[in-house]
């Protein structure tokens, strides 16, 4: 042993001794070879939220063994949140699924049978048999898919192709419908193009930050560190936080405001009125770049048509309509929202409302507004987004460093996959929609499929899918990368009945047993994160790639492999109409795999193009560079149309690029001359998503929530996440450190509400609504401090399914669920 190895050995022995550990006599031999302890490090975006942190991933002997923040990342600059620290453990839970499982009795499929391990061949045989029979009997509208903002870009793209171009149905929707659909509709209505115009660089330039329904301290902690650094480094910077309850982000707030649920609409209109009444309108900007419209009102709440609340609405069928108005009409509309009436309605003191409005009105103050689920999970979520843009447009505080209305994404690729790829039931890639015949034609040409394959009618959105499953209209259903039986609303009445409907066949692809897999008929084991090559797109339009670093356990396969392999089971004769095939005989007898994935475009990149240093299971399975082919075909949709992506190989070299990427250069601020290559010289600003290049300011009122407390159900319920857990906890609750940090959900309640009900901290209670109930324990201290009359229950805990209690009301425009407001009562269990 040389001196260096001797010193290393003694260091290990000393450390072990200090920790009270005994090493075997020959332990020094274990470390004499550096090859045996060598770690391979590679970059990957974090698996969790929409921030898009980059992490360095260490592998050894075929396993991920460590992660740390990537110091070269512009997003997180070497930092990780508590979930990011434990990324190395999310794939190694003891109950990881490793083989397909089919409900069987006596060797045959039985909806009421026990889950039994089967081969992939048997799984796909059974699945295809059900799909074919359903399509033959009822047509393609009876099959559907529920996907995810956690799909990789090419997984989502392959799913869209399979459903819309293969099966000829638009019945595909992502779980991003629950989190970002209102943001999408807000962007499209105001700007005609989706996703934020600003970027994270705004955080180093802003003079004020305003959080609307966003607990960044827990939900976007790395971004919150940048906000905190700016606030503490620059004494003039102010932070305002608005929410229906107090949370950790309030710790930094100079201007904290707790408002009554749903009254954010009135507060937003008050700010617009204040700007106008105090002569703070940026007339040069408004005259050149803005139009005014009045939106349709009394639009309902997205409930079933026969629901008494829904039946009262007058304009549900025309919810997205609007009519032109002028500035004077808009001024008159918002004039009713004066500080006295809005303070009374919202519960926010007048002086705080005035101070908030002045932040926006003062031309010397650069303002960045952040919002997430408090705005989007709202029966008027689209309106909230539109009203937020109204304020920034009135004062011209937009598309410049520090001036940004910024919708923060929740999932790692809700932007990059759900939105940009177009995995929604009404969308196609690059902001195109199925209802536009020109858009359908473009997609059919790029996909090299016959005209008429893509239906013009949008498919069933997320909540509608559950209803249609229950009603027997949707009979074959494939769920990937989500846990909707825990995450969806009103699961007792509208979720579980559809999954267990005897007429339906439910397939769930997942890495772990979940509430949703328990309700399935067939479970497919899925590869996770760096067990496959992937790409995500984050909240600032940054696309990031990673290589496959380890093998998935057992027979687990990526969602991409599952989609492509399943497509081999169908020929065009089984899924396309006779009329289409007679008019296009060259497609007859071909498999959907041949039409969609071996079409001369997706399969044109050879295996030699892949980096030989990295494994790639999909390449091995299909014989070509699958991810590159899918990405380059997909990128065709956006190039030259304001959604430009760089070439595939560039992303593996970079730490992500913000689109549009033109001539190799990313775009930080969209719509501004000199920053955005799509803005014409001499215009200053151009909102080119609209034909006339002008953004829209909407006149939209305050309207009440779908369900409010009454004498029997006397409290508001709000649900949400906590720092330690990701969504339904199916990954994070299997990490011991994260589980121990927050093992069980609790009901956060104001001490006065507890006292009124004869309750004390730690008491077991029932949280009950008209739809269902759960048992939990009362928490009157800690991070979340609801006002009197409201309780907060996080939804990560599968043993406390709070979505038994929630209402399946949605925004009538975006179809996004309101998880923040329903009426409950809390009683001692």
Swiss-Prot record:
PTM statement from Swiss-Prot or TrEMBL: Predicted to be exported by the Tat system. The position of the signal peptide cleavage has not been experimentally proven.
Electron transport is among the record's keywords: yes
Coiled coil: none
Signal peptide bounds: 1-27
Ranges of residues in domain 4Fe-4S Mo/W bis-MGD-type: 39-95
Keyword annotations of the record: 4Fe-4S, Electron transport, Iron, Iron-sulfur, Metal-binding, Molybdenum, Nitrate assimilation, Oxidoreductase, Periplasm, Signal, Transport
GO cellular component: membrane; nitrate reductase complex; periplasmic space
Cofactor binding note from Swiss-Prot or TrEMBL: Binds 1 [4Fe-4S] cluster.
E.C. code: 1.9.6.1
Required cofactor names: [4Fe-4S] cluster; Mo-bis(molybdopterin guanine dinucleotide)
GO molecular function: 4 iron, 4 sulfur cluster binding; electron transfer activity; iron ion binding; molybdenum ion binding; molybdopterin cofactor binding; nitrate reductase (cytochrome) activity
Main subcellular localisation: periplasm
GO biological process, one term: cellular respiration
Domain of life: Bacteria
Residues reported to bind Mo-bis(molybdopterin guanine dinucleotide): 83, 150, 175, 179, 212-219, 243-247, 262-264, 373, 377, 483, 509-510, 532, 559, 719-728, 803, 820
Any matching Pfam family: Molydop_binding
InterPro entries, per database record: Asp_de-COase-like_dom_sf (IPR009010), CT_Nitrate-R-NapA-like (IPR041957), MoPterin_dinucl-bd_dom (IPR006657), Mopterin_OxRdtase (IPR006656), Mopterin_OxRdtase_4Fe-4S_dom (IPR006963), MopterinOxRdtase_cofactor_BS (IPR027467), Periplasm_NO3_reductase_lsu (IPR010051), Prok_molybdopt-oxidoreductase (IPR050123)
Record-listed [4Fe-4S] cluster binding positions: 46, 49, 53, 81
Top enzyme class: oxidoreductase
Subunit structure: Component of the periplasmic nitrate reductase NapAB complex composed of NapA and NapB.
HAMAP family according to UniProt: Nitrate_reduct_NapA
Protein purpose: Catalytic subunit of the periplasmic nitrate reductase complex NapAB. Receives electrons from NapB and catalyzes the reduction of nitrate to nitrite.
Protein name: Periplasmic nitrate reductase
Gene source species: Shewanella denitrificans (strain OS217 / ATCC BAA-1090 / DSM 15013)
């Amino acid at each position: 042993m040389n001196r260096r190895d001797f010193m290393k050995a003694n260091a290990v022995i000393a450390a072990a001794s200090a920790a009270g550990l005994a090493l075997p006599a020959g332990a020094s031999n274990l470390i004499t070879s550096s090859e045996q302890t060598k770690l391979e490090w590679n970059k990957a975006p974090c698996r969790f939220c929409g921030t898009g942190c980059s992490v360095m991933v260490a592998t050894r002997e075929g396993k991920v063994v460590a992660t740390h923040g990537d110091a070269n990342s512009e997003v997180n600059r070497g930092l990780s949140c508590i979930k990011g620290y434990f990324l190395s453990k999310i794939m190694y839970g003891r109950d990881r699924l490793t083989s397909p499982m089919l409900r069987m009795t006596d060797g045959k499929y039985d909806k009421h049978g026990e889950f039994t391990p089967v081969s992939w061949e048997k799984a796909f045989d059974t699945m295809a048999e059900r799909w074919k029979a359903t399509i033959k009997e009822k047509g393609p509208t009876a099959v559907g898919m529920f996907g995810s903002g956690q799909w990789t870009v090419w997984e989502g793209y392959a799913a869209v192709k399979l459903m819309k171009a293969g099966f000829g149905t638009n019945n595909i929707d992502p779980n991003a419908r629950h989190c970002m659909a209102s943001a999408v509709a807000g962007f499209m209505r105001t700007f005609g193009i989706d996703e934020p115009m600003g970027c994270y660089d705004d955080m180093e330039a802003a003079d004020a930050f305003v959080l609307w329904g966003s607990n960044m301290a827990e939900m976007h902690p790395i971004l919150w560190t940048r906000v905190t650094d700016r606030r503490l480094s620059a004494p003039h910077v102010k932070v305002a936080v608005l929410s229906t309850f107090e949370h950790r982000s309030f710790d930094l707030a100079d201007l904290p405001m707790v408002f009554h649920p749903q009254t954010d609409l009135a507060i937003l209109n008050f700010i617009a009125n204040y700007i106008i009444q105090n002569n703070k309108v940026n007339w040069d900007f408004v005259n050149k770049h803005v139009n005014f419209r009045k939106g349709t009102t009394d639009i309902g709440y997205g409930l079933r048509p026969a629901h008494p609340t829904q039946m009262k609405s007058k304009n549900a069928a025309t919810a997205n309509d609007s009519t032109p108005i002028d500035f004077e009409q808009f001024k008159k509309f918002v004039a009713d929202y004066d500080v006295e009436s809005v303070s009374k309605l919202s519960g926010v003191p007048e002086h705080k409302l005035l101070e908030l409005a002045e932040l926006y009105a003062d031309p010397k103050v650069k303002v960045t507004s952040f919002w997430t689920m408090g705005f989007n999970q709202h029966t008027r979520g689209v309106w909230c987004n539109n009203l937020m843009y109204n304020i920034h447009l009135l004062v011209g505080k937009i598309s410049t460093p520090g001036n940004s209305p910024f919708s923060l994404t929740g999932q790692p690729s809700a932007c990059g996959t759900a939105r940009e790829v177009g995995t929604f039931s009404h969308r196609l890639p690059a902001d195109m929609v199925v209802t536009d015949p020109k858009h359908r034609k473009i997609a059919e040409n790029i996909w090299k499929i016959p005209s008429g394959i893509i239906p013009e009618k949008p498919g069933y959105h997320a909540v509608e899918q559950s209803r249609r499953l229950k009603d027997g209209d949707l009979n074959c259903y494939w769920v990937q990368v989500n846990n909707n039986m825990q995450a969806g609303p009103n699961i007792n009445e509208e979720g579980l009945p559809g999954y267990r409907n005897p007429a339906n066949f439910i397939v769930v692809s997942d890495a772990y047993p979940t509430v949703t897999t328990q309700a399935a008929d067939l479970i497919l084991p899925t590869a996770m994160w760096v067990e496959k090559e992937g790409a995500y797109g984050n909240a600032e339009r940054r696309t990031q790639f990673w290589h496959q670093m380890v093998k998935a356990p057992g027979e687990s396969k990526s969602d991409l492999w599952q989609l492509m392999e399943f497509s081999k089971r169908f020929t065009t004769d089984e899924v396309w109409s006779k009329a289409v095939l007679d008019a296009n005989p060259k497609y007859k007898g071909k498999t959907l795999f041949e039409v969609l994935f071996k079409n001369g475009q997706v399969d044109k990149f050879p295996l030699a193009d892949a980096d030989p240093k990295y494994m790639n299971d999909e390449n091995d399975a299909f014989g070509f560079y699958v991810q590159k082919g899918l990405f380059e075909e997909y990128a065709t949709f956006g190039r030259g149309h304001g959604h430009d992506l760089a070439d595939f190989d560039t992303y593996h070299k970079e730490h992500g690029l913000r689109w549009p990427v033109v001539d190799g250069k990313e775009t930080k601020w969209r719509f501004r001359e000199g920053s955005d290559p799509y803005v014409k010289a001499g215009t200053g600003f151009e909102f080119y998503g609209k034909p006339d290049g002008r953004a829209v300011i909407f006149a939209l009122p305050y309207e009440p929530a779908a369900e409010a407390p009454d004498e029997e159900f006397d409290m508001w319920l709000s649900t949400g996440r906590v720092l330690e857990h990701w969504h339904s906890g199916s990954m994070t609750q299997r990490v011991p450190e994260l589980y121990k940090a927050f093992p069980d959900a609790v009901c956060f309640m104001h001490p006065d509400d507890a006292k009124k009900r004869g309750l004390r901290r730690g008491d077991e209670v029932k949280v009950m609504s008209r739809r269902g109930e759960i048992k939990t324990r009362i928490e009157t201290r800690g991070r979340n401090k609801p006002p009197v009359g409201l309780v907060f229950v996080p939804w990560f805990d599968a043993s406390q399914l709070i979505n038994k209690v929630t209402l399946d009301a949605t925004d009538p425009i975006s179809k996004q669920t309101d998880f923040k407001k329903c009426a409950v009562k809390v009683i001692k269990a």
